[in-house]
Amino acid sequence: MSQLPVLSGKEIVRLLKSIGFTEVSCKGSHVKLKGFRAGEKRIVLVPLHGELAFGTLRSILRQAGLTVKELGDLLK
């Protein structure tokens, strides 16, 4: 999967929780999640707006330590 799918913030939060991230706080329209990937502590901020822009989605993936391919595998 080389292209990013169109996802909402709520869908990303659900995916991150499924791989072990936990919700730390929710302030306004953003959720802060904490988790561990590859032995590193990761903090991810996810906006809960409608569909996420591709740049925002890429930034969230980078913060979470995920690749586009791993995201595709999680969506299957």
Please identify what each model-predicted range represents.
Residues 51-76:
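C-terminal structural segments of small proteins and small subunits
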